[in-house]
């Protein structure tokens, strides 16, 4: 696909506003096709330093060799990916290891798919911990915590654009 075709598809099927913003920036005129370490590479041959770290998911960089090696070995052995509907020895072992690092009363793990889900779970833990007696949640208003109702309610930058109801007292 050309950059124009990609932009058209983004506009039609993903987010017209995001398309407008990205298209106005220099990187919005490029197609990125590969990445390694802290650099992303475009089809036109440019090497761009990625300051975002994948918005928090690429702390070790793009395609880190140790992670790639582990992934390749995992796939070569035809291991079952982490699956929440059946027993997973990986989740069992990881949760056991995590429990040794935390205080004794924090001995359960709850595996989630995203940061927004983690924030939502944190809100629920607060609610349960105080038996619904607390009426407010302390949060940073210059923040982004996710796009779900709860996480969006405590995201300062997202609240003004959100077209959904907010949690009370946020």
What are these regions (language model features)?
Residues 96-170:
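PLP-dependent aspartate aminotransferase-fold enzymes
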Residues 2-10, 67, 90, 94, ...:
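General structural feature for long, well-ordered alpha-helical segments within catalytic domains
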Residues 36, 51-53, 140:
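A secondary-structure boundary/capping signal
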């Amino acid at each position: 696909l050309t950059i124009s075709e990609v932009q058209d598809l983004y506009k039609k099927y993903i987010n017209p506003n995001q398309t407008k913003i990205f298209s106005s920036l220099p990187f919005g005129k490029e197609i990125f096709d590969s990445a390694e370490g802290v650099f992303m590479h475009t089809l036109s041959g440019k090497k761009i330093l990625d300051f975002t770290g994948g918005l928090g998911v690429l702390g070790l960089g793009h395609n880190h060799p140790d992670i790639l090696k582990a992934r390749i070995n995992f796939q070569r052995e035809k291991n079952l990916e982490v699956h929440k509907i059946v027993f997973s020895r990986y989740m069992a072992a990881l949760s056991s290891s995590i429990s040794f690092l935390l205080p004794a009363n924090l001995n359960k793990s709850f595996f989630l798919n995203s940061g927004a889900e983690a924030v939502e779970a944190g809100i629920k833990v607060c609610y349960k911990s105080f038996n619904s007696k607390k009426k407010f949640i302390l949060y940073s208003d210059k923040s982004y915590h996710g796009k779900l109702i709860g996480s969006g309610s405590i995201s300062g930058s997202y609240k003004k654009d959100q077209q959904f109801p907010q949690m009370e007292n946020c």
